[in-house]
Design a protein with these regions (language model features):
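Alpha/beta-hydrolase
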Residues: 1-59
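The feature captures the conserved acid-bearing segment of alpha/beta-hydrolase catalytic domains
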Residues: 55-65, 81
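Short beta-strand/loop motif that positions the catalytic acidic residue
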Residues: 64, 69-72, 76
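Histidine-centered active-site/metal-ligand motif
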Residues: 72, 83, 104
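Conserved alpha/beta-hydrolase "acid-adjacent" motif
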Residues: 77-83
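Conserved catalytic core of Hanks-type protein kinase domains
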Residues: 90
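Catalytic active-site module of serine/aspartate enzymes centered on a nucleophile-bearing elbow/loop
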Residues: 93-124
């Protein structure tokens, strides 16, 4: 898995053209390396991830008191827009930041600084 460009691992997935462009940027390489490593170990994480849509989580998100910022791209084909909206409405101290022009990966690449600054601001 380390012998090739990790962005090849996402080719053919449900990613937009913007995501494929974002996946080639150097700032995204370490995240893709992590994804490639995770995928090389099996797909249990996928089943766990998708099962969270089908069964109770074991806690009530409304009980979470720490502040959060939820970032979502308007062109995201992987995470429904309703998911970010629902989370922001059910986490008492959350705010939703939507970037209509961004995709699933693109938001992290193109708003990297803003995302980190918003996380740091929550710690103050």
């Amino acid at each position: 898995w380390q012998e090739h460009d990790p962005s090849e691992n996402i080719a053919g997935t449900n990613l937009s053209e913007n995501d494929l462009i974002a996946s080639k940027k150097p700032t995204w390489k370490s995240a893709l390396d992590s994804c490639a490593f995770t995928m090389s170990k099996g797909w249990d994480w996928v089943a766990d991830d998708y099962s969270s849509y089908l069964k109770p989580w074991g806690f009530d998100p409304r009980d979470i008191k720490v502040p959060a910022v939820i970032w979502q791209g308007g062109l995201d084909k992987n995470v429904p827009k309703q998911h970010g909206k629902w989370l922001s409405e059910n986490l008492p101290n959350a705010r939703l930041e939507v970037r209509p022009e961004e995709s699933h990966l693109g938001i992290f690449v193109n708003y990297e600084v803003e995302i980190m600054e918003s996380a740091i601001a929550l710690l103050k």
